[in-house]
Amino acid sequence: MTAPSMIREYEISAQSTAVFGRVLCSARNHHFIVDGPVQNGCPGEELTPPEVFLSAVGSCGVELVHVIAKDEKMPVESVNVRVRGIVDRGNQPRTDVTTFTRVELDFVLTGVDQKQATALVEGFKRR
């Protein structure tokens, strides 16, 4: 039996639309709209790129905590995470791109005790 690969590759496409600042994104056979923020003159009606990024981090956290709980046979009932991202343009770690200077995750788990919840979140951090 072959061991699973340590390398995973993902691909999406993004293309402009007839609406300024609105982008059509596709992943596999799924499509969704992303808007630039209002301060850039964009519609700002849909999720913005930073919100999509933070949503991806949050959904990864929820899904992986459930997977780890299942593997460890822990009775987690629900996993909620609040993700907050900060972009401090005056304190960027790099000069070639603008990045989040801080991303905070706050997990709330039910069905497990504090020790189990901590172990599950730590397991997510190591993934």
Predicted regions: what they are:
Residues 1-55, 66-127:
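Extended beta-strand/beta-hairpin segments
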Residues 60-61:
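Alpha-helical metal-binding/catalytic segments enriched in His/Glu/Asp
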